Swiss-Prot record:
Keyword Membrane: yes
Location in the cell: Endoplasmic reticulum membrane
MF GO annotations: 3-dehydrosphinganine reductase activity; NADPH binding
Naturally occurring in which organism (per UniProt): Debaryomyces hansenii (strain ATCC 36239 / CBS 767 / BCRC 21394 / JCM 1990 / NBRC 0083 / IGC 2968)
Positions that bind NADPH: G19, S21, G23, R44, K48, D73
CDD domains: KDSR-like_SDR_c
Residues spanned by motif GXSXG: 19-23
Protein name (record): 3-ketodihydrosphingosine reductase TSC10
Keyword list, A-Z: Endoplasmic reticulum, Lipid metabolism, Membrane, NADP, Nucleotide-binding, Oxidoreductase, Sphingolipid metabolism, Transmembrane, Transmembrane helix
Enzyme class: oxidoreductase
Record-stated family: Belongs to the short-chain dehydrogenases/reductases (SDR) family.
Bilayer topology annotation: Single-pass membrane protein
Gene name tied to this protein: TSC10
GO BP terms, alphabetized: 3-keto-sphinganine metabolic process; sphingolipid biosynthetic process
Active site per database record: S161, Y175, K179
Amino acid sequence: MLFSNNKIHAEGKLALIVGASQGLGADLALKLYQQNCSVILVARTETKLVAQIERIQSSSPENNATLSYKCCDASNYEDCVKLWNDLIVDQKQDPDFIFCCAGSSIPKLFSDLTAKDFAIGINTNYTTSLNITHTGFKQVLGQFSDLSCDQYKKRHVIFVSSVVSFYPFIGYSQYAPLKSAIQSLSIILRQEMGPFNYRVSCVFPGNFQSEGYEEEQKTKPSITKSIEGSSKPISGEDCADIILNQLNRGYDTVTTDFIGWLLGCSVLGVLPRSWGFFQVIVSFIFSIIAPIANYVVYRDVLKFFKTRSTREVEEYEIVSTDDNKKTL
């Protein structure tokens, strides 16, 4: 565990939250504001941002913190450059926390996905985080170029990956690889931005209730649901509470449930630890049982495709018979 004594201390600070028009980003904005932390909400859709501002303000009407929003397409690099220039140069606002929460999943079988689906996955789940972080870091370096590395103020970048980056499986080819890329990016930037007093954390949420989660259920293959199991998603606000609590305790690899923590033990690598001694033990156990678990999952996948193929043939035969009757 790195930065074990580095608590968030959100009160009186400023947070920039990208992807704050709904879901986890909006709930993190709510929780931070309730801790008297000023928040800038960033997303593309102004009407959604205004609605979130009203919701958050009504939760703590006597709060001294400020709430504002910026419309920005974080998948567009030049939009991000303009955002940071407006904040740091024009408005003299230098966020202490940068939460990269933009993301969406279209769970389908690989053969059912379209080029547009993949483009959305890349732009929303990876490019947004990359653009915001890179343009922000460049703006800070340019603005404070007269400072030595250790003189930069403390800043904190929080990436949101997913538990499926620990264990990717059928149905998530549009989503999981990009969340794995976020995990990898966080490791690299911990090295490259750390010398400039940036703390870099990566969050790996499990299922939580949100608008996005409801949309996922509409396209999610039955085999994907079967592998995930019937666990009930936690609320978005509970997820935000867990994340902020773990970050405040100094953890830079954050999971939101026990299953996520267990799966994280299977791919420890150079990730910052969370209960590291126990993770090493669980990791050893995983190295023994993982081949068996993979066999069981793959057996179910084979069964799914065989059943699916049989059903498609039967449906085709029924349609063909009906067409022949019409012809006669």
